[in-house]
Amino acid sequence: DEGWRAESQWLWLEKSGLDEDDLDDDDNLEVVLGCTEDDDCDDEGWYYFQSSGKVYTGANKKKINGRYYMFNNHGQMLYEWINGTAKTVSSNAQLDGVASAGSASVEDMRYYNAVEEGWRADGWYEMDGSEDVGTDGDTDWYYVDDGEIKYADGGYKDEATYDEDGKMVYVQRIKINGKYFAFNEKGQMQDGLQYINADSGFYYFDENGYQKTGRVTS
């Protein structure tokens, strides 16, 4: 309201449809938000104004006050599941759901925190899966390392097992903070008795995901 220039701060703004009436109210709308009604940006979102007073734009991650955030070409902060492959080829808000359901691999995806926070995720998250990966109907534990999901690398078919329907399933033991956990190729943590073909043996993981040793009773 005072007309001061926004510098080194976040602002929550509505997307402009570049309507002439809007531009009469604020001559900077077109410059700041750059989205048309046909673009897939959220109707509202966070934008970061740099020390120069100019909004940051660019389909990339940016370090702000010691934390990384992801943006699209219009400067809108992205959050939660982000399709990293699609983000680089479009100016629209590439959140989850831009690809055909199940067409992406978890390797393509990045996870940043909810819109209220938005910075790059690290650690354990119990959450719904990615729509692009086809796991959005399930709530599971995932481990995120600098925005990337830990998952079983299915690059070698001889390291796969098969489920009761004959579908190939990859399960891999991954060491996190000195303890082993099991993940499938979609990044979902696994529990119970798991056969790890790469290790030629069975392992048991409790309900919290920890690999057990010694005698196990149910």
Label the model's feature ranges.
Residues 1-218:
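Extracellular adhesion/carbohydrate-binding repeat motifs centered on closely spaced tryptophans
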